[in-house]
Amino acid sequence: MDLKEACGSEASRETESGGMGSLGGHSSWQSFAHRSTLHGLRFIFPYSSSSSSSSSYRSTSRRLLWSAALLASLVLLVLESTERLAYFLSYPHVTSVDAVVSGSLVFPAVTVCNLNAYRFTRLTQNDLYHAGELLALLDVHLQIPEPHLAEPHVLAFLTEKSNFTNYRPKPFSMREFTERVGHDLKEMMLYCRFQGQECSHQDFKTVFTRYGKCYMFNAAEEGKTLRTTMKGGTGNGLEIMLDIQQDEYLPVWGETEETAFEAGVRVQIHSQAEPPFVHELGFGVAPGFQTFVATQEQRLTYLPPPWGECVSRALDSGLFQVYSVSACRIECETRYIVENCNCRMVYMPGDSPYCTPEQYKDCAEPALAALSAVEGTNCICRSPCNMTRYNKELSMVKIPSKTSARYLEKKFNRSEKYITDNILVLDVFFEALNYETIEQKKAYEVAGLLGDIGGQMGLFIGASILTLLELFDYAYEVVKERLLDLLNREEEEESHGEDVSTCDPVVNHSESISHTVSVPLQTTLGTLEEIAC
């Protein structure tokens, strides 16, 4: 056997045995397993300080049992941790409901719309010329379409106003027409009280909706404070008596968007921060009845994605300062009509020109109907993250009673039949002086996830975060030791090559002596350099 190879293999064995960092003949992994806080690891890789340890400590069957137990615990830990992580990534939420007693509450905005948008007797000849076909009062030839269905006084009025011989039409605006011909609250309102104090039509703000000209009580206006209420129950809210003026309703000879088959008013109770959306969110109040509306304020808080689907930012169009579902719907309708018809309807915000009656009939109303059919895809309006809603409970009684009919006839100079057909009373009040909070909360957060996984680690393998740090620290030390060992080997190989080259003549001399028989075969070995040389 060549002396160089023997010396090289011996040196490598010495390096390997020293590189493991063993103590007392044990591997570094056994030492780590003995010191580790990971339960069961020291029984799988036993470590004993003396060679006379009991055989049961190193029993193969015992090690296999501990290995199976640790493996099963690791599998259960992975399964449970995966389930907890999947639950966390589903972003669950819970909803909490609470009732809060308050000393006072801001009274909601109350929007009232007559179901008839335009007063018949306020129509002018110019109105009929431009909007007669839109209102279904005249046909495309500006003629009365169904004269046999009209009452005598209605037919006489239309016959007079629809004579357009030598008529020169004047400019026409749908906004001005709606403002002028819509029902006037000053004429409709017979009395008004808020918390027992008298109020008037001046306490209402004019707004425009799909029903035309409407009126909002307790609107948010600059320079005015919102009304509050200190008590709940009837008499501590808004009470108004209205005359719906059925004599002014447009005659119905066909189905159009501008004519109504019902009689009464449409009412919406809403927050001052959101615009009225009466045609969808309002409720009807019929004449001949006093309607009591007991309401309760609800303050809702929703979570943003990924836990929920609420929206907190304002609309990009800038038409409304505060985001709400109603504002989003109106903004969507406005954008759709402007894009398709190059105009906007009277109730729509913005600076685009108002649609003409022809654009209303030929474009805006059909486009709005088409949008409503596919609104789920074109108008996606999510709930705001914070909103105020009002629950309502309605009840009603008939008016007038037989005993009060004479008095009301005398007071309002109207017959009992007129009162039954036209007069209504609306009473809006808080059911109690408290509000309800409905709040979405995160059901599972990072702290809960870490707590669950930490609990599973402690239960199954008796580990903690520090145990994981132990594993990482051991892996770091092993990698570092291997790298240092590799570098030392390279340096030794380089230095070994240099030493061999310096003793080449001696090698030749030894080779010449090796042929001498008198050289003993068993020579005492010297240092590594002597052997190599």
Swiss-Prot record:
The keyword tRNA-binding does not apply. Expressed in central nervous system. Belongs to the amiloride-sensitive sodium channel (TC 1.A.6) family. ASIC2 subfamily. Residues 90-445 are extracellular. Pfam families: ASC (PF00858). InterPro entries: ENaC (IPR001873), ENaC_chordates (IPR004724), ENaC_CS (IPR020903). GO terms for molecular function: ligand-gated sodium channel activity; pH-gated sodium channel activity. It is a multi-pass membrane protein. It is found in: Cell membrane. One of its GO terms (biological process) is sodium ion transmembrane transport. This is Acid-sensing ion channel 2. Disulfide bonds join C113-C214, C310-C385, C328-C381, C332-C379, C341-C363, C343-C355. Residues 1-23 are annotated as: Disordered. The keyword Heme does not apply. It catalyses: Na(+)(in) = Na(+)(out). Keywords: Cell membrane, Disulfide bond, Glycoprotein, Ion channel, Ion transport, Membrane, Sodium, Sodium channel, Sodium transport, Transmembrane, Transmembrane helix, Transport. Glycans are attached at N163, N386, N413. It comes from the Eukaryota. A motif (GAS motif) lies at residues 462-464. GO terms for cellular component: plasma membrane. Inhibited by the diuretic drug amiloride. The chain crosses the membrane at residues 69-89, 446-466.
